[in-house]
Amino acid sequence: LKIKGLYLKILVRTVDVSAEVVQGLSRGQNWSNLVKDICLKYKSIEKGNKQEVKREFFGANHFLHEYAIIKDVRLVYCPPQPMASYGGDDANWHWPRMSADFAILRAYKEGEDGEALPFSPKYYLKIKEDGIGPDEQVYVLGYPRGASYDWISADAKESFLLSMIRRAEVFGLRMGIINRNIQHLSAEDRLSWEGDLSSLNNERLKTLGRVSSFLRYMIPEKLIAREDSCGLLLHQNDIEKYWKFCNLKNKADSLVRLINPLVEFDDDYRDCVQSIPFINSAGLVKNKDRFSGNILSQLVDRVFRSSNVVMEKSVVKGLLNYLYQKNSIFIPMEIKDEKIGVDDYVDCLYRCSSLIEKDSVLSILSGNLSVQSDPAMKYLVYTDSIYKSDIGTNLVTYAGQLNEVREKILIMLHDCGFINWSGTNGTLRVSYGKTGTQCWSTNLNQDICKAWTSYGYKMVCDKSRDKQVILNFTTDCHTTGGNSGSPVLNEHGELVGLNFDRDVDGLCGDYYYLPSVCQ
């Protein structure tokens, strides 16, 4: 089955272009033109290849990576959906993880006569059929993206940790409302809301995991100690750099103090206001000229994928009551002025608004009907104006300045030997370690054949070949976002498994590399 838009990206060479980057930037050349010049200097090995220039080790090095691209990729096999998603997002970071979450693909290249031929790579991974045992050397090979930078001590201020706790609180609030009402829904409606529940719990667990691992392993204290040690070393060896380092730290702390009061407003806007269904439908109507007809239709389907008005009203009432109790600036003026209560406001809006039902929204999008006086549109305009005038602009400005300061601090920490890894940026990485003692195994034929037969597959159980096979195992390799599905190799270069997820404690690796937990 051909899959439009899917392609195979094969690394064919890497070139150190640090000298060219330094030379170009010193001449004042802008980045896009500099990359073009570098790609012209190192012409592609083959027509159709893709070249990327990536910065490594906080800007100490730059490399050109060239990839061969194969665009004809086809689906050969995937398990039944219930087996692929067994446990759902709720089971993330839990042991053992039992989902058959994989697919088998085949790539095709064009032959001399134009015929599509299966791609046969010069190098490939052999599968180790005997599985793997405890305490074996293993490697995770992949293109991670999740941990894009280390934190500095200014990032770990109380307000940032409280922000993550608030996010988890809102996720839990929405989950509680859905759980209380879901039993009253039809089987069809229940399915989409169960998907929402699973996604919300996934985000809640991830957020809480970051906070708990951050506090459990005293990451804020470790960040402070790392910077204090760097300052002491600079004071001994280079007093000028020491004062520069101190100034950067002071500037970071000042920027965080400016950002602090904005963070809670940003949380309210993103996690509450933008989670309200009619806000999203009003946004589509307001911004319809930005999208083509096909994309707009897909967005409408997405907004109304779980269209049950009773459930939606319950969720909206819960979110607005949450904002009202904390006296948020995003509470509608009618409620703020005590002209109407939260529940009555929501009931009235759902009676009067033409942006609640999918068919009505589609009709508005296809015509020129004005909805400026629609209560849902008025609330969207009200909340957007507050965010853009008082919060969004300042937050983007201060966050941009903090990013620049953070990077300079990280470079100094790297140069002094306190950071020895580069942020994951989608380039090829290998992490290494050993398998743990936790292994979960089953009888290959008897148990698996029985399970798959229940899905309609005709599978014969050959008792003579029945043997124990390890289906789940742990390693102490470092993985991060983007590593799901990455191949796990043994010391002979054989494929022994696919990486799925970290232990919940390892989530602190998104911001701070702690080998005892993250590796």
Spans of model-derived segments:
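Terminal presequence/propeptide segments associated with secretion/organelle targeting
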Residues: L1-Q519
